[in-house]
Amino acid sequence: MHLNAHRILPAAAMLTAVLLGVGCGTETSARIDPALPSMNSREVGSFMAGNFSNAAQAKDNPAFEDIRVHLRPIWVDRIDGQWLYVEQSLATSEDKPYRQRIYQVVDGNDADSVDCRMYALPGDALQYAGEWKVERPMRKLTADLLLPISGCTITLRKNEDSSWSGSTQPNECVPPASSGVSSMTSLKIDHDGFEVWDRTLNAEGQQVGGSTAGPYLFKRTAN
């Protein structure tokens, strides 16, 4: 759920796959794991599905851009996780998303974790703009055409308050030709919304990009 885009301020730069917000990593062919999702991954997938806005935060603090995020379940008959189409845009130009991704929510490596894998869309992603509005989004696209964003999976664990939180692994989400920088995304999500903080770090672990004012706070506006 990454928030960065060349059209937004450096403070918002890096999303993104929350929700919200990851635009980095090596793209290869999609890996499909034929395993029935657990109740944990189903819960995280249900928390992610919906429309979200950080309008209140942006109004109170000009360091944050006013952003809209739409996540829609897709391919609901598949058994290899919860699949969602993700579209992010500035509030002033919702018809021109700056980030479009596919998320695959699956069980993690142990019974208490859930992984959110990131995929890029093939070809010109803008051809899919607005798919979140249709009854059966992405029905003309198949999972084998997706481009995995390796190293940028977010691993989540459940908290005592029933929210889920986690992050990408340090130094693993590395953009091509990065010259020693990596991306770090932290996410906390529940039924009411999510917090996401995308940062770009140099080889010494110092932040060189992304929000310096803390995480973006997105509230659910519709299911």
Q: Would you name each region that the model predicts?
A:
Residues 21-23:
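C-terminal motif of bacterial Sec signal peptides marking the signal peptidase cleavage site
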